[in-house]
Amino acid sequence: MGPRYEKRGVKMNRKVTVVGGAGNVGATVARSIAEKELADVVIVDIADQKAAGVALDILETCPIVGSDSLVIGGSDYSQSANSDVVVVTSGVPRKPGMSRDDLLNVNFNIMKAVTEQVVKYSPNCIIVPVANPLDAMCQAVYKLSGFPRERVIGMAGVLDSARMRTFIALELSVSVENVHAFVLGGHGDTMVPLPRLSTVAGIPITQLLSKERIDAICKRTADGGAEITKLVGTSAWYAPGESAAEMVEAILKDKKKILPCSAYLEGEYGVKGQFLGVPVKLGANGIEQIIEIRLEADEQAALDKSAAAVKELIDVIKM
């Protein structure tokens, strides 16, 4: 167990735990939350000393950015007790020679072990899974935790939509702040970008870009993770980490913010009994509303295809 760092006379009311926080994505989540002073942060990782070191490094940024958040790290889950939100970034990437089923089962076993500890120490928390394959891992956490569906929320659509917004802004040479875009469906090849509902300062992009350019943007969005992996040699971490942090901020500040997230559906969008990326309202209670958009026939067909692909993954882990 790494060293603890106590603050003098300062008590934060919020606590966020990042499991797998010594890794790139987890450390980015932890740093963002601490630097914004959203909560105290606990980094839990099987790499005990690394977790303590990452926590100390982030803690030492706090005087520079003007944050009084406490950041501690280690392998002991007891530090995470009574967390408001637990972000789970634990998981292994697919390695050469590893089948999809092998990857699923390895990460399922990791999620099982993590979920048991999270439920033990923070039975009232909201869990935000980040590990891939995202929607299947959400299903595992939901079933294993016994939590209501409002309190298990997967990070996927925020990242995919951010990528789409980036590519639209680059194409039109406009501020990304003017760009709004939604990507629904599973976090993978079958994701469903919705250009019809994507806008720049309220103007539909269908009025600003040709179909060919829009199709190219949608394809680049779907390939966004692979593009970075090809360039860097490993998975992205800054954008995924900030995406999870945005969700945590919406929850802790009770923002009632509408974001695309992986949610357990009970008939919405014609999907029942599984996780899928849809627009949700995030607030203090987690998912406070699932927003149902009227989809065109081709959009619904694409979403159905995406749901079917996610179900295939879920069936592998028998959840």
Describe every region a protein language model picked out.
Residues G26-A27:
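N-terminal Rossmann-fold NAD(P) dinucleotide-binding loop
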Residues P63-C125:
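Rossmann-like NAD(P)-binding element
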Residues N13, D40, V44-S83, K311-M319:
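Conserved N-terminal Rossmann-fold NAD(P) cofactor-binding segment
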Residues A22:
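Conserved glycine-rich cofactor-binding loop
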Residues S99-R165:
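Rossmann-like NAD(P)(H) cofactor-binding subdomain of soluble oxidoreductases
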Residues S145-R151, L159-M319:
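C-terminal substrate-binding/catalytic lobe of Rossmann-fold NAD(P)-dependent dehydrogenases
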Residues V18-V19, I43:
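Hydrophobic Val/Ile/Leu positions in short beta-strands of Rossmann-like dinucleotide-binding domains
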Residues M1-K11:
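Short, Lys/Arg-enriched N-terminal segments with co-localized hydrophobic residues
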